[in-house]
């Protein structure tokens, strides 16, 4: 069985410039389950969310760059209205 986890770090200036050209996604506070059918990298613009997954949980905030691998099942809790770039 593959060990899937969410990776979170601060992006470089070059990454911010590149990612800021991508599409955005936003949500009001809510909870939902989500299965990643592709690898996704995202940069939080504003807001806050906790992502729970088998083996752990992470909370992402403005300025966080995070990666969710294909096949990961998450329970997302949007704590504050959130907006992110994603690709």
Which residues fall in each region the model found?
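Cytosolic regulatory regions built on CNB/CRP/Popeye-like sensor folds
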Residues: 1-11, 15, 23, 62
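Conserved short histidine dyad/triad with adjacent acidic residue
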Residues: 9-11, 18-37, 69-70
């Amino acid at each position: 069985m593959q060990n899937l986890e969410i990776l979170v770090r601060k992006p470089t200036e070059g990454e911010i410039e590149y990612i800021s050209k991508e599409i955005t996604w936003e949500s009001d506070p809510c909870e939902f389950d989500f299965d990643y059918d592709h690898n996704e990298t995202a940069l939080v613009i504003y807001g806050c969310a906790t992502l729970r997954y088998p083996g752990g949980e992470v909370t992402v905030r403005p300025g966080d760059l995070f990666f969710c691998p294909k096949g990961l099942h998450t329970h997302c809790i949007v704590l504050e209205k959130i907006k992110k770039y994603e690709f």
